[in-house]
């Protein structure tokens, strides 16, 4: 059963805070294991990655070259799709590409009053690695959401890793990689794949940034290699917060909550409303849906451990709670959803109106589904083209324009006791 809370309860603040508390990577033994894997991959390269892939994934590969897929294999997988699946995948890819094209940043410059040129140069990263969760239940949508923004950014080389338990792969993942323009694919996973991308091996080139979700070993490895390479984020369990008032279909709302609860036993689904009757209806609809849901066991554990039905006194109180949660996915199911969204400061993605289920955003709306979790929407953003670009400042002083700037730099450098700085500037105006 999903717990029911009311903001009028005396213990609500503490209970709600406890509900939100979750440590993504905080197991000393896990961190020790991951550190050892990374060290071994750095020392032994291909040999150790192959060994761990055979051990953990039971992959039948005899040599490292068996772990790399060819472009011909990707093309074959794409061409083997049924017309219906191919059209859906192409629609999703087209919409994702179109949305992310609007994010692409360009350089700029201007000449100041002193005649100096100042600006910013935008450059794509040279090479990126994308991690895609593997197995027969893997997600082609993750391929599109990670690879397409990199492609739009102008990244010339995209390396993808995806584990293949028992050597088996979801052909739709390969088709998505073909459609998204992935350069090379290796059927490896876990901390060893992250280490290989970060430091390189005899076969896998080192990348500049690693993106994509994975299990706790992957999350720990990404945290460990950060600094050697960039990363997108440390992904926690999936989250959804649904706020509803007025006329709503309780069955729709309940299924929206379960759409995230079915991901993982530690996923989080929270429903907030000022309408107690609607709260009752949603609670009942959840139980009815669970009776027929294939992943009911996972969803039931998720909502029992980390889910909640929350009764608030009004919309303003709900907004306070939403900003406290900073949810990965936020649905606003009411007539004034756009107006309410203006008061939301912290959320990964905001789905406005009764006809906008979170699932649309997962696949084909266009915006990225790689979103900040565990409250990190307070300070971070969805994955985007900007994650695959970097900026360099441009400064060019004219012979006359440098004089006043150099005098100021000279004075400030002296105050910081940096004599070489001061003299360097002074040479330009004396």
Curated annotation (Swiss-Prot):
Positions that bind NAD(+): 131, 192, 215
Family annotation (Gene3D superfamilies): 1.20.5.1300, Nitrogenase molybdenum iron protein domain
Family to which this protein belongs: Belongs to the histidinol dehydrogenase family.
Record InterPro entries: Ald_DH/histidinol_DH (IPR016161), Histidinol_DH_CS (IPR001692), Histidinol_DH_monofunct (IPR022695), Hstdl_DH (IPR012131)
Function: Catalyzes the sequential NAD-dependent oxidations of L-histidinol to L-histidinaldehyde and then to L-histidine.
GO terms of biological process kind: L-histidine biosynthetic process
Active site: 328-329
Organism: Acinetobacter baylyi (strain ATCC 33305 / BD413 / ADP1)
A Pfam family recorded for this sequence: Histidinol_dh
Keyword Isomerase: no
Reaction(s) the record says it catalyses: L-histidinol + 2 NAD(+) + H2O = L-histidine + 2 NADH + 3 H(+)
Pathway entry: Amino-acid biosynthesis; L-histidine biosynthesis; L-histidine from 5-phospho-alpha-D-ribose 1-diphosphate: step 9/9
One Gene Ontology CC term in the entry: cytosol
The protein's name in its UniProt record: Histidinol dehydrogenase
Coiled-coil spans in chain: none
């Amino acid at each position: 059963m999903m717990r029911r809370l009311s903001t009028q309860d005396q213990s609500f603040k503490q209970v709600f805070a406890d509900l939100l508390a979750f440590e993504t990577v905080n197991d000393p033994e896990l961190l020790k294991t991951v550190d050892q894997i990374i060290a071994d991959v750095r020392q032994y390269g291909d040999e150790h990655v192959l060994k761990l892939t055979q051990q953990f994934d039971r992959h039948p590969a005899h040599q490292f070259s068996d772990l790399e897929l060819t472009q011909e294999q990707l093309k074959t997988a794409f061409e083997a799709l049924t017309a219906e699946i191919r059209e859906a995948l192409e629609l999703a890819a087209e919409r994702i590409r179109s949305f992310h094209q609007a994010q692409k940043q360009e350089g700029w410059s201007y000449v100041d009053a002193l005649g100096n040129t100042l600006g910013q140069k935008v450059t794509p990263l040279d090479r990126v690695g994308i991690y895609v969760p593997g197995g027969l239940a893997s997600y082609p949508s993750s391929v599109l959401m990670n690879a397409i923004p990199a492609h739009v950014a102008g990244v010339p080389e995209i390396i993808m890793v995806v584990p293949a338990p028992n050597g088996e792969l979801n052909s739709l993942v390969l088709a998505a990689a073909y459609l998204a323009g992935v350069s090379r694919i290796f059927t490896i996973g876990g901390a060893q794949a992250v280490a290989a991308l970060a430091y390189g091996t005899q076969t896998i080139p080192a990348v500049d940034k690693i993106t994509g979700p994975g299990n706790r070993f992957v999350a720990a490895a990404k945290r460990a290699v950060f600094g050697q390479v960039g990363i997108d984020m440390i992904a926690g369990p999936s989250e959804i917060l649904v706020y509803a008032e007025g006329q709503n279909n309780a069955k729709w709302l309940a299924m929206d909550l379960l759409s995230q609860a079915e991901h993982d036993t530690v996923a989080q689904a929270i429903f907030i409303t000022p309408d107690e009757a609607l709260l009752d209806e949603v609670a009942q609809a959840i139980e009815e849906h669970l009776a027929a849901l294939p992943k009911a066991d996972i969803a039931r554990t998720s909502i029992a451990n980390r889910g909640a039905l929350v009764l608030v006194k009004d919309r303003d109180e709900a907004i306070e709670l939403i900003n406290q949660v900073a949810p990965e996915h936020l649905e606003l199911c009411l007539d004034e959803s756009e107006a309410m969204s203006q008061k939301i400061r912290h959320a990964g993605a905001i789905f406005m109106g009764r006809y906008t289920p979170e699932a649309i955003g997962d696949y084909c709306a266009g915006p990225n589904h790689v979103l900040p979790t565990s409250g990190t929407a307070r300070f971070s953003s969805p994955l985007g083209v900007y994650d695959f670009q970097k900026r360099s400042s441009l400064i060019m002083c004219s012979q006359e324009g440098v004089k006043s700037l150099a005098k100021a730099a000279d004075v400030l450098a002296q105050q910081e006791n940096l004599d070489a700085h001061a003299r360097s500037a002074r040479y330009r105006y004396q």
